[in-house]
């Protein structure tokens, strides 16, 4: 569970 805010940053 790490691509839950990374997607928003990218």
Swiss-Prot record:
Q: Which organism is it from?
A: Cyclocybe aegerita (Black poplar mushroom)
Tell me its family. Answer: Belongs to the aegerolysin family.
Oligomer status and interactors: Monomer.
Role summary: Has hemolytic activity against bovine erythrocytes at nanomolar concentrations. May play an important role in the initial phase of fungal fruiting.
Keywords, comma-separated and alphabetical: Cytolysis, Hemolysis
Protein name listed in UniProt: Aegerolysin
UniProt record, GO biological process: killing of cells of another organism
């Amino acid at each position: 569970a790490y691509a839950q805010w990374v997607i928003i940053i990218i």
